[in-house]
């Protein structure tokens, strides 16, 4: 599987299908591509905050790609003439050659509508994406929580995409603890250096993982760079 970081929490997973996650491109100073340049078969949105929902509707319309998200958010997005697949915690959607399992995240998840009103958009989530024998865990925005150990035991992800930026999510110490709980083979940090409040040096994360003695490869990507994971 080819994993490309598009800045912030946005990733493109490519194998037999193209799966786009949290496509915050417009307004993202680190985005390496424009929304109209992205091709996707499915779009996953972890929650309704603007820096995660991002350009999902526009990209979905252009690619005729379903948006997979929590049920309440799917009902809101369906008003914009896009196909949605509303899920809930613990459920798995099997579609095409992929399986997407929704898992909890510890965050908030409201949505600002076009009139500036704050409305409920369901719970925040993470996703386990299984494609071509590889399992990727995108945590969404979250703090570390003990049930991550269960997620690791149940799903055994190969690659974990997790925030390190602090302030709005867990920081480096929390992310290291999350790796202890989940035990992936590879960790790719995200949700940092987009804005001043989440400025972090990812090398500090790598050093902290090494200092803890964890058997996890830390892969640091620049926006637009890719990593290939093959079993």
Curated annotation (Swiss-Prot):
Coiled-coil segments: none
GO MF term list: hydrolase activity
Database matches in SUPFAM superfamilies: Metallo-hydrolase/oxidoreductase
Highest taxon of source: Archaea
InterPro entries, per database record: Metallo-B-lactamas (IPR001279), RibonucZ/Hydroxyglut_hydro (IPR036866), UPF0173 (IPR022877), UPF0173_UPF0282_UlaG_hydrolase (IPR050114)
Keywords from the named record: Hydrolase
Family: Belongs to the UPF0173 family.
Protein name: UPF0173 metal-dependent hydrolase AF_1265
Organism: Archaeoglobus fulgidus (strain ATCC 49558 / DSM 4304 / JCM 9628 / NBRC 100126 / VC-16)
């Amino acid at each position: 599987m080819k994993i490309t970081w598009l800045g912030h929490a946005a990733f493109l997973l490519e194998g037999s299908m193209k799966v786009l996650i949290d496509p915050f491109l417009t307004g993202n100073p680190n985005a390496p591509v424009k929304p109209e340049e992205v091709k996707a078969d499915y779009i996953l949105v972890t929650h309704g905050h603007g820096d995660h929902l991002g350009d999902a509707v526009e990209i979905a319309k252009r690619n005729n790609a379903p948006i997979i998200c929590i049920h309440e958010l799917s009902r809101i997005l369906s008003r914009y003439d896009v196909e949605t697949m509303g899920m809930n915690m613990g459920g798995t959607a099997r579609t095409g050659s992929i399986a997407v399992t929704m898992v909890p995240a510890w965050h908030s998840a409201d949505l600002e509508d076009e009139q500036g009103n704050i409305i409920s958009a369901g719970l925040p989530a993470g996703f386990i994406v299984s494609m071509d024998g590889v399992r990727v865990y995108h945590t969404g925005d979250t703090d570390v929580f003990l049930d991550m150990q269960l997620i690791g035991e149940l799903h055994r992800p190969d690659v974990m995409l997790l925030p390190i930026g602090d302030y709005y999510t867990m920081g480096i110490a929390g992310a290291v603890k999350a790796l202890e709980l989940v035990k992936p083979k590879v960790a790719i940090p995200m949700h940092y250096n987009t804005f001043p409040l989440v400025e972090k040096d990812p090398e500090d994360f790598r050093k902290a993982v090494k200092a803890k003695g964890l058997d996890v490869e830390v892969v640091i990507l620049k926006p637009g760079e890719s990593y290939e994971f093959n079993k």
